[in-house]
């Protein structure tokens, strides 16, 4: 345990004496001395750590203060920018008015007025400086006086509004501009003082490093954190206060398809009495409209293809043909809320998002959501929805699953408008006039040409008669495994096709029992969502489109389904497809707003309809194949003449269009919107109906072949069946997540839906 050559005890003293008297030797530290030295160094490091911590806290406080001033300045800058554009627009309009009035003056006065107008336009810098000096910057004011004035001008602070329409009264604009400039001066003064203080601190540290500076053995000084921050003038901003962090696939989406998952919600189907459209409450009480998404903003997000990789929308000149503008209110919010709503994404096209998005906002824009659903459901902002979890169309501001589904588009919730009596035995009872005795608010309104809204008195046969369903029964649940953004059912009603992420699965629903896919058609990229799939009438070919520039045509007649052709366009995504009645032509709605016409026999691009200024989200074709109806994230529905290749009509709305359907018997067009409303328009008259049962974006819509009823689905997890055209509610089904897509069989016997909880549901329609 001890060295064997240690000298005997009686010799140690003499050895020590000899050592003391001998030549000096190197200092040898004992263990206690070493421990004391380590303790001192530890205490020094601890002190250094403490000083660095205090400095870090100080810097954090300064950062918070600077950010607060930055936000304040941003609000002021935004207000000034809006005011500048507003005044510019006013000047343009006044100039036009002057130009129109001059010809009415006498010849001698015309020249004088023209010269006076020209003189008024010649504003010199001296005049500008004089005006600014008088109105905004009294030279004698000190910084403290400016601060006091700034505080008085900004109590409360300027609201950062999403739309110019919500600015203050013009009379307040000047005060707002003046106070904004004063606030900016205060910000500059504060920044100058702060920089001076930091420079002084840095100089002091250079002279006396003190305990907050580490010194290396070679005499070099280790820079402190504040030294680094002061010298690194090009550092990136650490945080973006208004940005959205899409940290996972489940939260991300191009256009923010927005999907709400609530597995606890049971499936339920309710039938309602036709007499439940009360007339005692003609105006609906709704929650405040959702905040504008960057798209509408886009969902937009985000089923707005919400909201969030935003694909810059291709700004195309609107078709030159005169459009039929809808002059009647488009929604209840038109009557009660000022200005357009905004996605996301785009809503944050979002988004503030993407919109978000979308929101597929959508989120088509929002986002393929919301903020958003489709990509960003339709806010589509754009071609790929990456969420592993539930997303849904609101990225139109479909919100794709990453859509925020949206942002997109975000959630556009509103309070329930109607409470239904589920007893079907009430169907045959009741007069044609909805009785106010029920005390239930109306959900269906007729809008006349002059914009007057009145609750619809349903006829006695609204829910009875040939071809009108009584309810629907859930028949099969098809566990696809990914968010189901597209569904279709074959004419034979034996096979159902469900489109999810990167593939279409084929299901045989002709037999009872647990269902497994009989085939899987891999198309697009593995991480891109299928947005639409359409069967040709003969059932031998399937066309698939989605978050890619290529459409795939599958040969289903071969022993093993295979791709027999691919159609490639310049747009990064396809949101919807339609097939002509003769199956010779395919129409695809693109994320750049164009409608591409494909010759299926020669597999070539025939023409493009240009008019939508944002993604085209939905499409339907008339029964005779002569007219095409399209809806877009630019808040318009357009009708195209397929024989002449031109636009016939245009209807403008205050909300992004996520879905539409044209009645097979003609005359009526149903439009589902991000605002949660459905509008049923007469194609040749100004009359229309507004339906208010959905509580969030209407993501899909499909007419029955008989034309007497149609179904709609939404982000509120609902499947609603409606009577054409006045919208009496036939039945309603509640699913466990956002219902992104639907289809009705050609014999009107089955309904298929695709939802955000990664499954499709087959319903049997009971008559």
Curated annotation (Swiss-Prot):
Residues 200-209, 235-255, 277-289 have a biased composition (Basic and acidic residues). Keywords: Nucleus, Repeat, Ubl conjugation, WD repeat. Residues 294-306 have a biased composition (Low complexity). GO terms for cellular component: nucleus; transcription regulator complex. It comes from the Eukaryota. Ubiquitinated by XIAP/BIRC4. Gene3D superfamilies: YVTN repeat-like/Quinoprotein amine dehydrogenase. This is Transducin-like enhancer protein 1. It comes from Xenopus laevis. The gene is esg1.
